[in-house]
Structures are given as structure tokens and as C-alpha cells.
A protein has these predicted regions:
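N-terminal, active-site-proximal structural segment of metallo-dependent hydrolase catalytic domains
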Residues: 1-55, 66-73, 129, 148-149
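Active-site metal-binding loops of divalent metal-dependent hydrolases
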Residues: 7-8, 134-136, 172-173, 245
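Surface-exposed cleft-lining segments at the edges of enzyme active sites
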Residues: 12-16, 94-107, 134-144
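His/acidic metal-ligating clusters that form di-metal
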Residues: 114-123, 128-132, 144-170, 182
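Metal-dependent phosphoester-hydrolase catalytic domains
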Residues: 156-167, 174-252
Length: 252
């Protein structure tokens, strides 16, 4: 099965030929060609969510928006119905009070951040995966670090139905590999960074190739099942899938 983290990039008119309306067809073609079982989308707004749902009826979407009013920008995890069944899920805020909508850390930017937990049954194997889709703060390293610590704490507190041996933590972490913000994950012996060999994920629509800020961490127990990890670098006539390269993990 294939699991993808995909920062969609909000629908900004200022992106010109790379505005979402021009990228949507390329995104559709790529997903139809690759047929990933799971796609963890970040930077989803209501308009782009509506387009995705219309283009991809083969997928079930679970997620939510990040503000106190449950609007604006958010995260959604798409599950291919042929391969998976959504058993449950939860939206929680990366903050000292995860169940208060719109809450955030004191060190954070003005934007709240959410985590999307999905409990996913893989039909072919019968196993249940716990997938955490994240988009961390873009201004404060400390807030990003606390967001990851909050996610690890969530896994520990919900061990009754979150199996750490079948857990994946992925998304746009907004920090580079040398950042101390990653310490909550790197200090966990049961986790490893499956994207360690990837050097670039954020490319600003082809303008740079020196920033890796998107990650897929997963349980050490699953390491031997990883057959490939690669960015999707598709481009057509100057149009990219996003300003980030989506990253695809293949599991047996």
C-alpha cells in the first residue's frame, strides 16, 4: 500500500499558473495513476476540499478546520475505499488544551494547529493503522516542538486503541532535519524517520531545492516493510502538484 503526505498549498490567486485551479487536474491525474491508499492533505480550505471530493469519489475524507469557528484552513486525510475502512478518528488541537477548538501554545503564531488522527483498517492485510496528520507552526520552533510532543502524548494516553507498533506521524512539520523541534520524535526509540534520505520537499514551485520540511515517521516495527520512499516531483509546462513535493511511502 502507498501512504502519502501532501501539502496542497492554499488556493492563492497570486500563484499564477500554479494557482490551485490550474493544479487540480494534475493532482487528480497523479492520484489516479498512483492509487495511494492514504493521502494526508495539509493546507486544505473549503473550496479545495469540495474540488477534491468531486474529483476523488473513490476516497473518503476525514479531518477538520483549525479555528474556533471550525473554518479557514485545515487538514484532511483521504482513504481509498477499495483498500481501507475508516474505523474512527479525532481532531485535536496542538496546544495545552487539545479539546478546546482554536487553542494554541503561547509561543505560537496567530494560527491554531490541529492534528488529525485516523484509525484505518487495511482490507488486504486486516491490520489497523493509526495515522496522525500534522501541520506544525511555521514561525516558532518551540511551538512546533510542543506540537510533536503533544502528538506523542496523545499516543501514550490512548494506548487502549492506538497501537504504537502500527502508528505513523506524518505531514508538514515546517522545520528542517537539524531542528531541535524534531526531538520529541527522535527521542522515541520506537519511531524512525522514513524520509531520512530525502533532501528536498519544499521547492516554492521550482524556485528552490534546499528545504526538507515534510516527513513520515513510523514505528520501528514496520521498518522492514518499507519498500520505497520518494517525493512526487511531477511538473507539466511549469505547473507543479504543489509548492511542496508530496512524499509517498510504500509498504508491503
Amino acid at each position: 500500500m502507498k501512504i502519502v503526505t501532501f501539502n496542497l498549498r492554499c488556493a492563492w490567486r497570486g500563484d499564477g499558473i500554479n494557482s490551485f485551479i490550474h493544479r487540480a487536474g494534475l493532482i487528480y491525474e497523479k492520484i489516479m495513476a498512483e492509487r495511494p491508499s492514504v493521502v494526508a492533505f495539509q493546507e486544505v480550505i473549503p473550496a479545495s476540499l469540495e474540488v477534491l471530493k468531486r474529483l476523488l469519489p473513490e476516497y473518503e475524507f476525514f479531518g477538520g478546520m483549525r479555528t474556533e469557528q471550525y473554518d479557514g484552513e485545515g487538514l484532511y486525510t483521504a482513504l481509498r475505499k477499495e483498500d481501507t475502512t475508516l474505523l474512527g478518528g479525532e481532531v485535536f488541537w496542538l496546544s495545552p488544551t487539545p479539546y478546546i477548538a482554536g487553542s494554541r501554545f503561547e509561543e505560537q503564531s496567530i494560527f491554531p494547529r490541529v492534528g488529525i488522527y485516523t484509525r484505518v483498517l487495511c482490507k488486504q492485510t486486516g491490520e489497523v493503522l493509526s495515522i496522525f496528520n500534522l501541520h506544525l507552526d511555521h514561525l516558532s520552533t518551540e511551538a512546533a516542538q510542543k506540537g510533536l510532543a503533544c502528538t506523542v502524548a496523545y499516543i501514550r494516553e490512548h494506548r487502549g486503541y492506538v497501537d504504537a507498533d502500527k502508528a505513523l506521524i506524518l505531514g508538514d512539520f515546517n522545520v528542517t532535519p537539524d531542528s531541535p523541534a524534531l526531538s520529541p520524535l527522535r527521542e522515541e526509540a520506537w519511531l524512525y524517520d522514513a524520509t531520512e534520505g530525502i533532501t528536498t520537499t519544499f521547492h516554492a514551485f521550482g524556485k528552490r531545492r534546499d528545504a526538507k520540511i515534510d516527513y513520515i515517521f513510523l514505528s520501528e516495527a514496520m521498518r522492514g516493510r518499507v519498500t520505497a520512499v520518494a517525493p512526487w516531483q511531477d511538473e507539466h509546462a511549469g505547473i507543479y502538484l504543489s509548492d511542496h513535493f508530496p512524499v509517498c511511502l510504500s509498504l508491503t
